[in-house]
């Protein structure tokens, strides 16, 4: 259980993370984390302004000691603090809050994958989405908001330390966030 003010980053990358970057500084937050060697659950409430709170939860798992997979869901209602969002086992999209608050609510979805195929090499993929218009929706005025990061990095040992080599590709359409 953590209560504090500071940065919160999801996904270690060379450029700022497309999911949540360390450049969001001085934001008060409440964090509940439950973890084991193969499973991690994280519930987070970040206060962005007096009437704006970002509610997120994340589930992470490690498979075969080489693959880490994370799924994150979040909602950003513009209004007063909402007690319904404190339930750590809630699925935010199931509350119908989007119909209740109308256009004053944003959703968020993120995926993080880390793969370590061999020692000293890491491949990673980060995906973020905050808007998706279904083909069945009548109003097509809201544009898609998504982006991803793909990279690899290696720390090669030497006698006096490590050489850090990496490459990263970053794409975000203009309407992400």
Q: Which residues does each PLM region occupy?
A:
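Signature for the C-terminal beta-barrel architecture of outer-membrane proteins
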Residues: 9, 21-177
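Small/polar (Gly/Ser/Thr/Ala-rich) solvent-exposed segments
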Residues: 4
């Amino acid at each position: 259980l953590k209560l504090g003010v500071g940065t919160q980053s999801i996904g270690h990358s060379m450029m700022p993370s497309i999911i949540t970057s360390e450049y969001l500084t001085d934001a008060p937050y409440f964090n509940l984390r439950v973890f084991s060697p193969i499973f991690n659950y994280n519930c987070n409430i970040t206060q962005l302004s007096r009437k704006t709170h970002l509610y997120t939860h994340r589930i992470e798992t490690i498979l075969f000691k080489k693959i880490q997979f994370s799924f994150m869901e979040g909602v950003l209602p513009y209004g007063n603090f909402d007690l319904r969002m404190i339930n750590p086992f809630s699925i935010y999209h199931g509350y119908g809050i989007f119909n209740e608050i109308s256009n004053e609510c944003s959703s968020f979805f993120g995926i993080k994958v880390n793969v370590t195929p061999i020692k000293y090499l890491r491949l990673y993929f980060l995906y973020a989405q905050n808007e998706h218009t279904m083909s069945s929706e009548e109003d097509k005025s809201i544009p898609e908001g998504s982006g991803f990061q793909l990279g690899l990095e290696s720390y090669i040992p030497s006698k006096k330390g490590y050489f850090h080599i990496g490459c990263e590709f970053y794409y975000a359409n203009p309407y992400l966030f």
